[in-house]
Amino acid sequence: MSYIPHSEEETKEILSKLGLESLEDLFSHIPKELFAKDFSFPEPKSEEELRRIFERACEDTELPLYFIGAGAYDRIIPSVIWQILSRGEFLTPYTPYQAEASQGTLQAIFEYQSLICELTGMDVANASMYDGASALAEAVLMARAIKGKGDTVVLSKALNPLYRRTVKTYLRGYEDKIVEVPYTEEGTTDLNNLEEVLKESEVHALAVQYPNFFGFVEPLKEIGELCKKYEVPFVVFVDPIALSILKPPAEFGADIVVGEGQQMGIPLSFGGPYVGFFATKKEHVRKMPGRLVGMGEDIEGKRAFTLVLQTREQHIRRERATSNICTNQNLMALANLLYMVLLGKEGMKKVAVQSLSKALYFKKELMKKGFEEVFTGKHLWEFPLRHESLKAIYRKLLKEKIVLGLPLDRFYEDLKNTTLIAVTEKRTKEEIDSVLALL
């Protein structure tokens, strides 16, 4: 057992002083028949396997089986994350307003910002936003400020429809035209249509999702080249887990990268609280919304963390402020930080690869049951499938506490009888096979 403090040399020294030759001699006074011959311990289990055992033992706590994503994903959360976050130092303090306050909290936020930059490939990240949707909307406003002129915002129709709705809400006070670029048979943004829009309109912001709402990997290289050609600020909404196996948007010329951090250590919780992350290029930092923690030195030359470039309406004239966000999601951001630190690059890559391999298996078996592909593009762990009897299948599985994806006709009229299915590393082969057995 690795936690016994005595080394082999120390054990020999103690036995020598006691006049004994072995540990067995130390217990020679105990009758041999009292010694256990075989403990019959089961094989060791992971934390997640133990959690499932206890859940099954408590019948009243049986949870639905989720194969639904669309921006919120049922992933494994190491229990140590919320053990740490439950400490009073993290759980109860309010976000520090004074620049010098709470060095521990400020350092934690600084470390979070650093890892978000590493994940996205960008130069600077802020202390977090309310959620992914508000981060995207703020990114569009920032892109408008970067461009300085124009009257059109372009959104891919393959971008999460709820996020698009949030952007439209934020833009209600402006006189912008919002153009939604359609998707192709591959399930990705139509590049020909996009170039026509960029050519014919005064565009001051373009936003796409990577991978997109349907789970397909957008051609960021080509989109980035179009943005550079027509001098349009490029906003990319990303999946943080996907970035462990995909090239970061920074390599394709993204000006602003945002995303939803729920997948990294935050439970589903009826839709919140979540956390949005926000990163950009160094040259745009003065137009970035939200709080920003920097590292410097105090008057004694010691390292000190402080809030910097505070351009909220509480600090400067309202009309010159970059945002009016009143607080950040500091506790949720720390959950993201702990998740990234605990899993590391390789751990997050394993999460992504497991999710992808299970998704491919489930998709292949579902297609044997009469489901059909809707698009031809390359996806990760989320994909849409069509079935003529989808509503009947959906109702049947709901009775068994199984949620088979999100019906897409709620958002897209041309996607009748289509469901958007997501498979995470949390789903086991036994669970997947149990669903297939019901079809």
From Swiss-Prot:
PANTHER family: GLYCINE CLEAVAGE SYSTEM P-PROTEIN, GLYCINE DEHYDROGENASE (DECARBOXYLATING). GO terms for molecular function: glycine dehydrogenase (decarboxylating) activity. One of its GO terms (biological process) is glycine decarboxylation via glycine cleavage system. Belongs to the GcvP family. N-terminal subunit subfamily. It catalyses: N(6)-[(R)-lipoyl]-L-lysyl-[glycine-cleavage complex H protein] + glycine + H(+) = N(6)-[(R)-S(8)-aminomethyldihydrolipoyl]-L-lysyl-[glycine-cleavage complex H protein] + CO2. This is Probable glycine dehydrogenase (decarboxylating) subunit 1. Keywords: Oxidoreductase. NCBIfam families: PRK00451.1 (NF001696). The keyword Oxidoreductase applies. The gene is gcvPA. The glycine cleavage system is composed of four proteins: P, T, L and H. In this organism, the P 'protein' is a heterodimer of two subunits. The lineage of its organism: Bacteria, Pseudomonadati, Aquificota, Aquificia, Aquificales. Its EC number is 1.4.4.2. The glycine cleavage system catalyzes the degradation of glycine. The P protein binds the alpha-amino group of glycine through its pyridoxal phosphate cofactor; CO(2) is released and the remaining methylamine moiety is then transferred to the lipoamide cofactor of the H protein.
